[in-house]
Amino acid sequence: MVLIKLNIIVAFMLALSGVLIYRSHLMSTLLCLEGMMLSLFIFMAAMITHFHMFSISMMPLILLVFSACEAGVGLALLVSISNTYGNDQVQNLNLLQC
C-alpha cells in the first residue's frame, strides 16, 4: 500500500509541476489539472477501501462530477478564447478588459 500511495503522490506532483511549467498555454494547463483530479480520485478511492470508511464512499464520485464540470467549463473557455484570439496562449489575454 505504501508504494501505491507513493505512486499516486508522485503522479499528483508531476501534474502540479506540469501546471507550473506549461502555464502559458491553456490547453496544457487544463490537461495537467485533469491529471491532478484523477490522481486525487484514485487516492481517495484507495484510502476509502484501505481504511474501510464506506460511509464516505460517494466522495470520489462527487470529485469526479466536479472534475467533469471543471473540464467542461475549461474547454468552453478554451474554445471561446481560441475563436476570439486565434490561439490559446494566456499571456496574450487581457483579462481586465471587458
Curated annotation (Swiss-Prot):
It catalyses: a ubiquinone + NADH + 5 H(+)(in) = a ubiquinol + NAD(+) + 4 H(+)(out). It is a multi-pass membrane protein. It is found in: Mitochondrion membrane. The keyword Translocase applies. GO terms for molecular function: NADH dehydrogenase (ubiquinone) activity. It is an enzyme of class 7 (translocase). InterPro entries: NADH_UbQ_OxRdtase_chain4L/K, NUOK/Mnh_C1-like. The chain crosses the membrane at residues 1-21, 36-56, 61-81. It comes from the Eukaryota. Keywords: Electron transport, Membrane, Mitochondrion, NAD, Respiratory chain, Translocase, Transmembrane, Transmembrane helix, Transport, Ubiquinone. Its EC number is 7.1.1.2. One of its GO terms (cellular component) is respiratory chain complex I. One of its GO terms (biological process) is ATP synthesis coupled electron transport. Core subunit of the mitochondrial membrane respiratory chain NADH dehydrogenase (Complex I) which catalyzes electron transfer from NADH through the respiratory chain, using ubiquinone as an electron acceptor. Part of the enzyme membrane arm which is embedded in the lipid bilayer and involved in proton translocation. Belongs to the complex I subunit 4L family. This is NADH-ubiquinone oxidoreductase chain 4L. It comes from Didelphis virginiana.
